[in-house]
Amino acid sequence: MSIPRLKSYFTILATVLVLGQAVSAQAAELPDFTQLVEQASPAVVNISTTQKLPDRRVSNSAQMPDLEGLPPMLREFFERGMPQPRSPRGDRQREAQSLGSGFIISADGYILTNNHVIADADEILVRLADRSELKAKLIGTDPRSDVALLKIDGKDLPVLKLGKSQDLKAGQWVVAIGSPFGFDHTVTQGIVSAIGRSLPNENYVPFIQTDVPINPGNSGGPLFNLAGEVVGINSQIYTRSGGFMGVSFAIPIDVAMDVSNQLKTGGKVSRGWLGVVIQEVNKDLAESFGLEKPAGALVAQIQDDGPAAKGGLQVGDVILSLNGQPIVMSADLPHLVGALKAGAKANLEVIRDGKRKNVELTVGAIPEEDKDLSMLPKSGVERSSNRLGVAVVELNDEQKKAFDLKGGVVIKEVQDGPAALIGLQPGDVITHLNNQAITSAKEFTEIAKALPKNRSVSMRVLRQGRASFITFKLAE
């Protein structure tokens, strides 16, 4: 072998060794979940529920067709193939069953799961890892967070370690154990896709988003970090097909345990409440309110006699922080407020009329049901038209008092123009235009005449009791 060939040989050999070491290093970095699963599985349970429903298929003879007009042979033929009527007292009951998951958080038998797993159940059955089955008692449930606390009789039961969901970061490995489609102790894995996610109609939970495969039956089961600690409760998926599509959501264990402790001690959950309706600040709204960039929560509506009203918060305020914690998106505010107790102090940093201001108020307790404002009644006051393409009338004193409005105008007619383009409708109430409160139809017309062109202008609109700010631009 010549010297040049010998050098080439050693060069190739060295390259192969380096590549082999790199591959081995990458393989070594991949997690092994074996020990985690072995230690955690005994405390993960299968939950089955039974709900008794009335059998409404045939309840009385009024549901039977009239066969009296048929010949005897035909009548006998049809009667043989039809169910016989029963009296209402003879109605049978049928059962609806569902499956889910849960996990043990105390040695004496307390179990966490989802509210939707056990909702409306007449009987809850828990199957442990050793296949034994026990009836569970519902201690309490919180539909707003989708958390439920159960209790089974037992002692020295296996218990899961609880972590801190606030320490999670996007990109970290996570593991789920549950009973998808009834297959007990199924293990799936993935990564944290995002934290602090907000979902429609889920205002009080900053969800953990993952790509862990979650299917029917996984709900209520634990989500683990690599230390084997529970960091969340698997709750729901985003799907267009009905099956898993790579986007799943878990309730942070910090939130779940706060709910659990309140249910255990008081049977219900208390949350902080400001009494406001807020909306996202987009680019156009940021320009309209003089903000450097889209951020914060825009106050679109304030409930009469609520904490915000008593504390001096105003419609049009943009809330930038609460007790020093920044409000990057509007969805951040309900999470932070909900975590406060009634009576706690809340210091809000807001933008009002283009200037920063601090507003301090006392947090209230969230009511069982939010006040429902109905569509405002029509007024018979004289019309006023304007360059926006709407005909408006003023609110009378009775309407202002009934709906706690100091002013505003009702749209009676929408014509071709900017109003039609932004979706305004007859019956909508306009309370603010270009950050100015409207007290009369005449004032509305005057403000409309002075609106700037080619710049975002805000308008506060009340529709069916719900207020929001919208923006538009007037062309040259």
Curated annotation (Swiss-Prot):
Binding of substrate, residues: G217, N218, S219, L274, G275, V276, V277, I278
Keyword check for Hydrolase: yes
Location of this chain's protein in the cell: Periplasm
Keywords from the named record: Hydrolase, Periplasm, Protease, Repeat, Serine protease, Signal, Stress response
Disulfide bonds: none
Reactions accelerated catalytically: Acts on substrates that are at least partially unfolded. The cleavage site P1 residue is normally between a pair of hydrophobic residues, such as Val-|-Val
Family annotation (InterPro entries): PDZ, PDZ_sf, Pept_S1C_Do, Peptidase_S1_PA, Peptidase_S1C
Protein name: Probable periplasmic serine endoprotease DegP-like
Annotated source species: Pseudomonas fluorescens (strain ATCC BAA-477 / NRRL B-23932 / Pf-5)
The organism's taxonomic lineage, starting at the top: Bacteria, Pseudomonadati, Pseudomonadota, Gammaproteobacteria, Pseudomonadales
